[in-house]
Amino acid sequence: MSGNLRTRRTVRHSRALGIALTPKAEKYMERRPYGPGQHGRARRKQDSDYAVRLKEKQRLRAQYNIREAQMRRYFEEAKRTAGLTGENLVELLEQRLDALVLRAGFARTIQQARQLVVHRHIMVDGKRVDVPSFRVKEGQMIHVHERSEKMVPFQLAAAGAHQQVLPATPGYLTVEIEKLRATLTRRPKRSEVPVTCEEQLVVEYYAR
C-alpha cells in the first residue's frame, strides 16, 4: 500500500471514529472537523446504546492497532485482575512494547512503532524483541539496537522530532531520547495514559 493511500485511509478512519490516530490525521481533522463522506456535515441521528459502546471499543482498538481477538483477550485478563476492569484494560494495553516505543518518541505513529519492533530494531534489556504485544515489566529498559541507530528514522527520533508532535512523555516512562533509551519505571495508571476512551463503555460492550 502506498504512503498516500495509507494516509488517506488513516485520516478517513480517524474522522469516522472522531479521534486523530496520527499527527497527520490531527491536522486534517482540524480543517475538517466532521465525519467522512458526502453526509459527513449532516446532523447525525442519535446512536443506539449498542452503537455508542461499539464505537468506543473500536476507538480504543484503533489507538493500539490491535485485532479484535487480541482486544478480547486483554479484556478477559483485565476482568480477572483486581480493580476496575476498564482501567485495568487500558493499563495492560499500555504495557505493550509497541505502545511504549510510541510513547518514548522513537516512532511517530503506533503503526510505525509496530514496524520497528517487527523488523527487530528494538531491544528490551539488551535482547532483541520482535513481538509488538510483548509485555514490558517495571524496570525494563527499551532501546534501539546499535546497528539501527544511524538510520534516518532513528536520527530524527533522537533529535526529538517525534516528541514535538506527540503527547508529553507520561510519568511511568523515563526517556533519554538522545540515547534512544526508555525505562518503564512503574505500571501505567489509567489517568496518565494518553488515549481517548471512555473505558467503562468498552466494559459494557463486552459484558453484554
Swiss-Prot record:
Annotated S4 RNA-binding domain ranges read 95-155
Keywords, sorted A to Z? Ribonucleoprotein, Ribosomal protein, RNA-binding, rRNA-binding
Pfam families cross-referenced by the UniProt entry: Ribosomal_S4, S4
* Location of the region described as Disordered in the Swiss-Prot/TrEMBL record: 29-48
User: How does this polypeptide assemble, per the annotation?
Assistant: Part of the 30S ribosomal subunit. Contacts protein S5. The interaction surface between S4 and S5 is involved in control of translational fidelity.
Task: Give GO terms for biological process.
Answer: ribosomal small subunit biogenesis; translation
Question: Which family, according to UniProt?
Answer: Belongs to the universal ribosomal protein uS4 family.
Q: Give one GO molecular function term.
A: rRNA binding
- For this entry, the protein name equals Small ribosomal subunit protein uS4
